[in-house]
């Protein structure tokens, strides 16, 4: 099962990728463009050119997980910009991003009252 823990390193690729790419192509992209070993356990997030889908790639020690989320309406409104090939996010920021939010602005509560 895919689990995102607070100790995980999360990298969001700045450039959009061709969504026909699978595990092997995305793992090579991690090595070549993001300068990170895809077997490191780091969680990698990629965006489609139209910003309607994202892919998450992670190695769990036994094999790769590749998950895709395609929005039924709208687009991912936030994506990192800049000269760097990737931007690191914290777990709560990644959760906001996966919900199509803006990790720089939208805050998720660390806990909520019951």
Predicted regions: what is each one?
Residues 1-114:
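Polybasic/polar functional segments that serve as interface/processing modules
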């Amino acid at each position: 099962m895919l689990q995102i823990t607070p100790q995980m390193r999360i990298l969001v690729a700045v450039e959009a990728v061709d969504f026909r790419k699978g595990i092997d192509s995305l793992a090579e992209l991690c090595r070549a463009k993001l300068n990170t070993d895809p077997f490191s356990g780091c969680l990698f997030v990629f965006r489609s050119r139209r910003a309607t889908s994202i892919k998450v790639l992670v190695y769990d020690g036994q094999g790769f997980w590749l998950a895709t989320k395609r929005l039924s309406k709208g687009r991912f409104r936030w994506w990192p910009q800049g000269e760097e090939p990737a931007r690191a996010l914290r777990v709560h920021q990644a959760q906001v991003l996966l919900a199509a939010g803006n990790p720089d602005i939208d805050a998720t509560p660390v806990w909520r009252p019951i």
